[in-house]
């Protein structure tokens, strides 16, 4: 049984049909990509999956439980965490503090314990700091722990967003254009990181990505949206050769390259 299933998801904004009967499944141990031309509905699907939007139709099932109607923080606590297309860090907090903020969904200390600075609070604080430092190192930010997030390079900020998302200890990690604005070396480094995460830190990754060399080089499964509808699904090579995908991308003057190109 799939770890996550989206069944017939539809979403309208006034007269605009943003998503139309979209279904997909995400299995344990998989890196899957969600691709499509600009305006295809990819981020809308992420926003619907994470509770920012409620679908007009359809079901979202995670571990045999419906996520429809849950608030974003409850979905995070359930085990699904994400990054955003537009970076959303606390610029005047340090790298370490930003990662610690991401742990709020897993905190088990009561408000009185926090206010009274109890032993349990201090124990969780120490554990949290240790975990945050581990994630900082994992994402290549060692030595930048006390740097303000706003002082990081664009690529470093992307990595920090990933570290913060991992701090919630998700089973599924959703990444919205994680390599946007990166050069080929930076993108390759992130691809290596994503492969390391599977099985050790998360069970599955679903990413939105416009860098087709990343998509074709890392994905076990690729789902393609166009005008809010899913037009193709398969392994990278199947999708690259699908006439519907070729037509959708050629309509924008772009092409889906081979990962070796």
Indicate residue ranges for each PLM-predicted region.
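Glycine-rich phosphate-binding loops of nucleotide-dependent enzymes
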Residues: 1-261
């Amino acid at each position: 049984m799939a770890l996550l299933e989206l069944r017939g998801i539809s979403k309208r904004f006034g007269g605009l049909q943003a998503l139309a009967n979209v279904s997909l499944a995400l299995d344990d141990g998989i890196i899957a990509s969600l691709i499509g031309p600009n305006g295809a509905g990819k981020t809308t699907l992420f926003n619907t999956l994470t509770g920012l939007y409620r679908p007009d139709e359809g079901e979202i099932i995670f571990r045999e439980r419906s996520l429809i109607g849950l608030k974003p923080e409850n979905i995070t606590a359930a085990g699904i965490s994400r990054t955003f297309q537009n970076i959303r860090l606390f610029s005047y907090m340090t790298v370490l503090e930003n990662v610690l903020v991401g742990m709020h969904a897993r905190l088990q200390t009561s408000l009185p314990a926090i206010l009274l600075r109890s032993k349990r609070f201090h124990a969780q604080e120490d554990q949290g700091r240790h975990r945050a430092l581990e994630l900082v190192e994992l994402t290549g930010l060692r030595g930048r722990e006390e740097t303000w997030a706003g002082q990081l390079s664009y690529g470093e900020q992307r990595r920090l967003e990933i570290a913060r998302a991992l701090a919630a200890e998700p089973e599924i990690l959703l990444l919205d254009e994680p390599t946007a604005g990166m050069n080929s070396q930076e993108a390759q480094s992130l691809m290596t990181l994503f492969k390391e995460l599977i099985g050790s830190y998360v069970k599955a990754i679903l990413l939105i990505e416009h860098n087709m060399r990343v998509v074709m080089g890392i994905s076990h499964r690729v789902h393609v949206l166009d005008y809010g509808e899913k037009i193709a699904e398969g392994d990278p090579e199947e999708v690259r050769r699908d006439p519907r995908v070729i037509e959708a991308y050629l309509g924008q003057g772009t092409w889906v390259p081979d990962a070796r190109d």
